[in-house]
Amino acid sequence: MAATQYYGTGRRKTSTARVFAKVGTGNITVNKLPLDEYFGRETSRMVVRQPLELVEMTEKLDINVTVKGGGNTGQAGAIRHGITRALMELDESLRPSLRAAGFVTRDARKVERKKVGLRKARRKPQFSKR
């Protein structure tokens, strides 16, 4: 059974997604909920489906995801990254097309920390001339 299941770990911001893909009918489950129930926003659902639509495997794979940390955007990005890695494990010849679409690269942007003496990460306190 393990040979028919493909795994990929995806990360984005503070979210981590563990993605298991196997041949099936196109069901996507996130934390034991259907994709449409888990993500309220259409954009998040679209982001998750992007790699599958690119390689035209939307109806051919069942995907089961466990995702932790972060918010909606981070989780959707992490799932997309994980699905991409699972697809590459399934068929290495998909790598160039996924790379060209920008799904293989891990988005390294994270929230910048707040600095001492500043209001936020870069926002300085208001300056009064007089």
From Swiss-Prot:
Task: Tell me which family the UniProt entry assigns to this protein.
Answer: Belongs to the universal ribosomal protein uS9 family.
Instruction: List the residue ranges forming a coiled coil, or say none.
Output: none
The record's GO CC annotations read: cytosolic small ribosomal subunit
Q: Which domain of life is it from?
A: Bacteria
Return the PROSITE patterns for the record.
RIBOSOMAL_S9
Recorded GO molecular functions are:
RNA binding; structural constituent of ribosome
Instruction: List the GO biological process terms.
Output: translation
Name this protein carries in UniProt: Small ribosomal subunit protein uS9
InterPro entries, per the entry: Ribosomal_Su5_D2-typ_SF, Ribosomal_uS9, Ribosomal_uS9_bac/plastid, Ribosomal_uS9_CS, Ribsml_uS5_D2-typ_fold_subgr
| Family annotation (Pfam families) | Ribosomal_S9
Work out whether the entry's keyword set contains Cell membrane: no
Stored SUPFAM superfamilies? Ribosomal protein S5 domain 2-like
- Key words, A-Z: Ribonucleoprotein, Ribosomal protein
Q: Lineage of the source organism?
A: Bacteria, Pseudomonadati, Pseudomonadota, Gammaproteobacteria, Alteromonadales
